[in-house]
């Protein structure tokens, strides 16, 4: 099993129909071996997770990751809305651990210590839990039960001339980060790869002790660059089982594939131009469009070849399935905007366990986790023609703790 925030995936179909489980399940025997012209599909489990203790309020679920026991970790921003505050419901701890049945088995984290603006989450090959924060300058490594083991960067001090967080494009410090979005660990040697993508636009690499090794990337649209602006570019870093690093370049609507030293191997488009909608930030071209983008997070199927890549498209409230054996062709997808089971609002993270169950997290407006169970395959000839989503949820104003994704 490959440990990252997820591990396998199986995936997808007719937008809402299959995601909501209206189709009769296909044979489970085929769920691990895809064939040309077939798309893996999921059915939503509307009863996952089970009610959490003491009416905890998780707020926005920014990151989702899975350990070697198929326990699901979520990182929660704990931002109660007005109704929740009026009832006096307690805030959940920043990190909550669930078993596969949806029971809370542990929870931990000191709100004063964890990164501001909790964001990405990763479980490494030793079952340590890593978290990043896009309102801060740190990435942290915790033991499985929540003991802080390592911190890269300085809390409240970012890579900028004044140390302020969110000042764009410094891209220079070997010791400071600038609102990192995500983190991944190389199981071969323990090196740490950081998507330093909200203030900076780089992948920064550290050894297992936190010593800076190298970096690559800058703001732009050329191959090897990451989209300008403050929306998390790069937004995810995920290793495949060949040791290649897949990096989400969200507002450029693409996944960029690098070797461990930053040599670009491939650029994979993800529905270009469809995930950008009117909003407060605007694109660098001055169009007044929201740079939310379509390449937010990803994971792979658990078969030996990792045939399928699953990409979380926040701008279109969809999950796309790519066939890597067919030149990273998009086979299909599921999801639509909404708040019912199987729908997404600010679809932010995706993770898959060793059984092929997919777990998702939603931030602004969504504020929840969902579970999708694999149910065989469907022929691509039954898939709907894609239409870009006109829906978006307004992103919040600028602030120290970014909530946009």
Mark where each language-model region is.
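Eukaryotic scaffold repeat domains enriched in small/polar residues
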Residues: 4-10, 19-405
């Amino acid at each position: 099993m490959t440990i990252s925030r997820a591990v396998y995936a199986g995936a997808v179909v007719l937008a809402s129909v299959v995601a909501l489980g209206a189709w009769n399940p296909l044979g489970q025997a085929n769920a691990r071996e895809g064939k040309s012209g077939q798309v893996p599909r999921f059915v939503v489990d509307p009863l996952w997770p089970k009610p959490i203790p003491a009416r905890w309020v998780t707020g926005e679920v920014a990151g989702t990751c899975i350990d070697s026991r198929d326990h699901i970790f979520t990182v929660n921003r704990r931002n109660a809305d007005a109704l929740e505050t009026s009832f006096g419901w307690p805030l959940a701890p920043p990190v909550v651990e669930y078993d596969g049945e949806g029971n809370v088995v542990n929870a931990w984290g000191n709100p004063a210590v964890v990164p501001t603006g909790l964001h990405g989450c990763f479980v490494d090959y030793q079952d340590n839990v890593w978290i990043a924060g896009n309102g801060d300058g740190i990435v942290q490594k915790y033991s499985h039960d929540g003991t802080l083991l390592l911190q890269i960067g300085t809390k409240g001090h970012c890579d900028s001339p004044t140390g302020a967080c969110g000042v764009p494009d410094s891209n220079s410090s070997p010791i400071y980060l600038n609102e990192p979005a995500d983190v991944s660990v190389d199981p071969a040697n323990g090196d740490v790869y950081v998507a330093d993508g909200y203030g900076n636009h780089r992948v920064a690499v550290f050894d297992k002790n936190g010593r800076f090794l190298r970096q690559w990337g800058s703001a732009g649209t050329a191959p090897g660059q990451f989209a300008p602006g403050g929306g998390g570019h790069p937004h995810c870093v995920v290793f495949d089982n060949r040791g290649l690093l897949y990096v989400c370049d969200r507002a450029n609507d693409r996944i960029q594939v690098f070797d461990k030293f930053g040599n670009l191997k491939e650029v994979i488009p993800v529905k270009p131009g469809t995930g950008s909608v009117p909003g407060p930030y605007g694109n660098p071209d001055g169009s007044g469009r929201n740079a939310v983008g379509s390449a937010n997070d990803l994971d792979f199927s658990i078969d030996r070849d990792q045939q399928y890549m699953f990409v979380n498209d926040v701008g279109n409230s969809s999950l796309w399935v790519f066939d890597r054996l067919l030149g990273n062709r998009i086979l299909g997808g599921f999801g639509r905007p909404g708040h019912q089971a199987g729908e997404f609002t600010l679809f932010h993270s995706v993770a898959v366990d060793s059984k092929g169950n997919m777990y998702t997290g939603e931030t602004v407006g969504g504020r929840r986790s969902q579970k999708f169970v694999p149910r065989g395959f469907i022929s691509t000839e039954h898939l709907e023609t894609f239409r870009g989503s006109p829906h978006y949820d307004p992103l919040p104003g600028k602030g120290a703790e970014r909530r946009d994704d």
